[in-house]
């Protein structure tokens, strides 16, 4: 085992796992920390947790437990994966988890690299942009759990962590990996614990990956994974078949959408023109014990459609706000996730093999409900969104973070069926 990744949510885990596979590392994703014997034959293992927005102490406990399991498997380098939009608050969880992992490893310095240029997440002079907009001006400022009202990664990291951040700017990065290494050493000597790095193109990430090869712990989004993988694949004999085990096959398929992001709204709107679709009634989720059974009947009447039936809770910002005000943000969200859980189980029991899911929380709930312990990582549908196939059984899933993929994502995912 070469690389161990601790991801703070399910879609983030498949995101980084997909980039590792695309760059030649045989990768398995585990849903939570294995208990008992679990044999892993891979170059990289990604543990997906649900620690992005849980209480800080819980996030630390779970992340450190994941690290200890990866250490026991002989991993040589570790990566703490969080969202490329740095989803967090002044309380955490990115900073506290980073500090806990450093302490557990006996290290005092790491890199902070949220950038994912291929999906429009770039860092320039320490400020995070989403498709050219400052993070605080993007749709992320309306996020219901972690509204992002700042764009300075240095400032955000320092607000939620025990150490001090320093910046490696793009001018240094464009001088090459030796210049970056020198700057990292300089920051470390100055007492910085975190090196926030600029990155707004793929070349920056390759350079940063080369400079990070001596770090025991790296933190960031999935963008840097390509550079890290390249460090390891130089020493691997066969990289040609890394994604084969995770490829999907044609079988009964359903699309779930629980995300309310701007891109998911666009994806749902386009897909509704192609496929049968069912909008979830939040009040029914809260009050009707048989609602999942009723929607199950609807899905099964459309399961043989040319395009898989869509069941969605996706709503635009104003509609979402109205729902939260009427039913409560937590209560409505929990009820919808429980609905997806019940529906997923019933569909699996009745022969549905492929699940396309939009939204990190929804993906986590569905994956847990289907009792999938781990995945082989397959081909990428879009940057950061691969098909994955269960290690045990014959389920395939496409787990999409809210804003990932283009407008045609749901239909494109189905073009991969063999």
Specify the residue positions occupied by each region the protein language model found.
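Cap/lid and interdomain-hinge subdomains that line or gate substrate/regulatory clefts
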Residues: 1-2, 59, 67-205, 418
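N-terminal basic/disordered segments at the start of proteins
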Residues: 1-40, 59-63, 115-118
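General beta-strand structural signal in soluble alpha/beta enzymes
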Residues: 5-7, 28-30, 78-82, 110-114, ...
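Short acidic, glycine/serine/threonine-rich loops at helix termini
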Residues: 16-18, 90-94, 121-129, 179-180, ...
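A structural-propensity feature for long, helix-poor, extended segments
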Residues: 43-51, 305-307, 389-418
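Conserved, well-structured core segments that form the ligand-binding/active-site neighborhood
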Residues: 131-298
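C-terminal structural cap/anchor segments
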Residues: 299-358
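Conserved, well-ordered active-site substructure
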Residues: 352-353, 361-409
């Amino acid at each position: 085992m070469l690389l161990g990744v601790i991801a703070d949510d399910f879609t983030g885990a498949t995101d980084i796992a997909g980039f590792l596979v695309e760059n030649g590392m045989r990768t398995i994703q585990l849903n939570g920390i294995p208990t008992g014997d679990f044999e892993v034959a891979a170059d990289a293992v990604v543990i997906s947790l649900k620690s992005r927005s849980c209480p800080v102490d819980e996030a630390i406990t779970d992340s450190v437990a994941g690290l200890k399991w990866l250490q026991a498997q002989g991993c040589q380098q570790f990566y703490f994966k969080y969202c490329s939009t740095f989803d967090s608050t002044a309380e955490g969880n990115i900073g506290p988890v980073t500090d806990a992992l450093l302490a557990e490893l006996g290290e005092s310095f790491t890199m902070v690299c949220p950038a994912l240029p291929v999906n429009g997440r770039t860092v320039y002079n320490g400020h995070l942009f989403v498709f050219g907009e400052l993070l605080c001006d993007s749709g992320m400022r309306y996020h219901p759990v972690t509204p992002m009202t700042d764009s300075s990664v240095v400032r955000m990291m320092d607000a939620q962590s025990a150490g001090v951040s320093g910046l490696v700017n793009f001018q240094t990065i464009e001088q090459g990996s030796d210049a970056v290494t020198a700057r990292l050493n300089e920051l470390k000597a100055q007492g910085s614990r975190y090196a926030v790095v600029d990155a707004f193109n793929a070349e920056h990430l390759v350079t940063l990956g080369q400079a990070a090869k001596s770090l025991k712990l790296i933190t960031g989004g999935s963008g840097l994974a390509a550079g890290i993988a390249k460090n390891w694949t130089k020493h691997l004999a066969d990289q040609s078949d890394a994604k084969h085990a995770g490829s999907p096959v044609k079988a009964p398929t359903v699309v779930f959408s629980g995300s309310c992001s701007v891109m998911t709204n666009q994806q749902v709107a386009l897909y509704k023109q192609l496929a049968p679709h069912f909008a979830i009634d939040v009040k029914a989720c809260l009050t009707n014990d048989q609602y999942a059974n009723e929607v199950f009947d609807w899905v099964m009447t459309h399961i043989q459609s040319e395009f898989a039936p869509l069941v969605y809770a996706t709503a635009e910002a104003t509609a979402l706000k109205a729902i939260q005000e009427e039913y409560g943000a937590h209560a409505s969200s929990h009820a919808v996730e429980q609905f997806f859980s019940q529906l997923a189980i019933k569909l699996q029991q009745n022969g549905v093999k492929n699940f396309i899911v939009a939204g990190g929380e929804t993906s986590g709930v569905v994956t847990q409900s289907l009792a999938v312990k781990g995945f082989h990582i397959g081909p990428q549908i879009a940057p950061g969104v691969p098909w994955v196939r269960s290690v045990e059984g014959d389920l395939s899933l496409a787990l999409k973070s809210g804003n990932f993929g283009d407008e045609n994502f749901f239909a494109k995912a189905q073009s991969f069926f063999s």
